[in-house]
């Protein structure tokens, strides 16, 4: 089966087809300070400048060996285009939402007709095109973005999101519907620009914040709508110990489910989802990849591979201060497993 390219291998793995070896990449954020310095493309400029955005994204493929190019580096691009106020962060801190446009009601809340021309969306789409031109057709590009649940909480504020989920469910559902619509439009624009996989991170959907009952009753249908509406392979990442919702996540229609080490072993995760979706992860970003040492990274990777992980990856966004050699160790672990 040596006819695989990086792209066909990743897509086959996510679709549950046989592959010669498990791909190793990151479906979550990949910008690390060491690479910013090496290639001269640093945050926060790389969040707005398409050339720098592309350069930094390509660096983690070229210099660490991750088998996909993933961009951008935050979960605020769509929120900003929908009216959220953003703090653009620093060289080692990601952008974050600082103010929500609709904390009291949804008067005037719609998906703007010019959504794809707003704020940083054109820069992301341009960066994807630059990446494709530079890496050629055989390297997969992963477009990352906030999921509809997290977007909804950004639009109305986390406080209102929690409150409305119990007391004003009509408004809660309206916020989710607007967010799903905007998310599908942005995702498909990334696909059109050249992304092969769309990976959404939806931390607000985690049982840490929303009950499994709320997930089942309100959130699952919007995630299903998203995966059905996007014209590519999709991956759903939800942070935290998601065991209580993992089976429901597997019914959301995403090819891949990206999980942290908090779920337990890959084998335990696979047991829950069966063949309904593929498991991506679950090497700890904060507790293993960031601090190392290398033998711990390799040992964790081996456990994941032996447990049947479908795509070996960091369990969450790579911490900006993670050393390059630690990311390389993740790739080496996969190579050694098949040696």
Swiss-Prot record:
<dbReference type="InterPro" id="IPR052024">
    <property type="entry name" value="Methanogen_methyltrans"/>
</dbReference>
<comment type="similarity">
    <text>Belongs to the uroporphyrinogen decarboxylase family. MtbA/mtaA subfamily.</text>
</comment>
<feature type="binding site">
    <location>
        <position position="237"/>
    </location>
    <ligand>
        <name>Zn(2+)</name>
    </ligand>
</feature>
<feature type="binding site">
    <location>
        <position position="316"/>
    </location>
    <ligand>
        <name>Zn(2+)</name>
    </ligand>
</feature>
<dbReference type="GO" id="GO:0015948">
    <property type="term" value="P:methanogenesis"/>
</dbReference>
<dbReference type="Pfam" id="PF01208">
    <property type="entry name" value="URO-D"/>
</dbReference>
<dbReference type="GO" id="GO:0004853">
    <property type="term" value="F:uroporphyrinogen decarboxylase activity"/>
</dbReference>
<dbReference type="GO" id="GO:0032259">
    <property type="term" value="P:methylation"/>
</dbReference>
<dbReference type="GO" id="GO:0006730">
    <property type="term" value="P:one-carbon metabolic process"/>
</dbReference>
<keyword id="KW-0484">Methanogenesis</keyword>
<keyword id="KW-0489">Methyltransferase</keyword>
<feature type="binding site">
    <location>
        <position position="239"/>
    </location>
    <ligand>
        <name>Zn(2+)</name>
    </ligand>
</feature>
<dbReference type="InterPro" id="IPR038071">
    <property type="entry name" value="UROD/MetE-like_sf"/>
</dbReference>
<dbReference type="InterPro" id="IPR000257">
    <property type="entry name" value="Uroporphyrinogen_deCOase"/>
</dbReference>
<keyword id="KW-0862">Zinc</keyword>
<keyword id="KW-0479">Metal-binding</keyword>
<protein>
    <recommendedName>
        <fullName>Methylcobamide:CoM methyltransferase MtaA</fullName>
        <ecNumber>2.1.1.246</ecNumber>
    </recommendedName>
</protein>
<dbReference type="InterPro" id="IPR006360">
    <property type="entry name" value="Mtase_MtaA_CmuA"/>
</dbReference>
<keyword id="KW-0808">Transferase</keyword>
<dbReference type="GO" id="GO:0006779">
    <property type="term" value="P:porphyrin-containing compound biosynthetic process"/>
</dbReference>
<comment type="function">
    <text>Methyltransferase involved in methanogenesis in the methanol pathway. Catalyzes the transfer of the methyl group from the methylated corrinoid protein MtaC to coenzyme M, forming the substrate for coenzyme-B sulfoethylthiotransferase. MtaC can be substituted by free cob(I)alamin in vitro.</text>
</comment>
<dbReference type="GO" id="GO:1990088">
    <property type="term" value="F:[methyl-Co(III) methanol-specific corrinoid protein]:coenzyme M methyltransferase"/>
</dbReference>
<dbReference type="GO" id="GO:0046872">
    <property type="term" value="F:metal ion binding"/>
</dbReference>
């Amino acid at each position: 089966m040596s006819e695989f390219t990086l792209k066909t291998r990743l897509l086959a793995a996510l679709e549950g087809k046989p592959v010669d070896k498990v791909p190793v990449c990151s479906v979550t954020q990949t910008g690390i300070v060491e690479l910013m310095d090496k290639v001269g493309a640093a945050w926060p400029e790389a969040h707005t400048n398409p050339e720098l955005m592309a350069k930094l994204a390509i660096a983690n493929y070229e210099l660490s060996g991750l088998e996909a190019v993933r961009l951008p580096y935050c979960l605020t691009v769509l929120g900003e285009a929908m009216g959220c106020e953003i703090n653009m962060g620093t060289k080692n801190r990601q952008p974050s939402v600082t103010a929500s446009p609709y904390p009291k009601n949804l008067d005037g809340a719609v998906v703007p007709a010019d959504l794809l021309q707003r704020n940083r969306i054109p820069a992301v789409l341009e960066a994807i095109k630059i990446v494709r031109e530079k890496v050629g057709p055989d390297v997969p590009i992963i477009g990352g973005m906030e999921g509809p649940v997290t977007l909804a909480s950004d639009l109305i504020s986390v406080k209102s999101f929690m409150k409305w989920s119990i007391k004003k469910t009509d408004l809660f559902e309206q916020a989710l519907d607007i967010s799903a619509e905007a998310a599908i439009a942005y995702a498909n624009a990334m696909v059109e620009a050249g992304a092969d996989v769309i990976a959404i991170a939806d931390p607000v959907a985690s049982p840490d914040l929303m009950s499994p009952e709320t997930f089942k009753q309100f959130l699952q249908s919007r995630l299903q709508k998203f995966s059905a509406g996007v014209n590519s392979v999709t991956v759903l990442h939800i942070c935290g110990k998601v065991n209580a919702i993992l089976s429901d996540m597997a019914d959301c229609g995403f090819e891949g489910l990206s999980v942290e080490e908090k779920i337990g072993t890959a084998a335990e995760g696979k047991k829950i989802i069966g063949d309904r979706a593929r498991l991506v992860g679950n090497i700890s970003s904060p507790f293993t990849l960031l601090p190392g040492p290398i033998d711990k990274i390799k040992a964790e990777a081996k456990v994941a591979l032996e447990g049947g992980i479908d795509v070996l990856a960091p369990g969450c966004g790579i911490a900006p201060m993670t050393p390059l050699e630690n990311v390389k160790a993740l790739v080496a672990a996969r190579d050694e497993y098949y040696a």
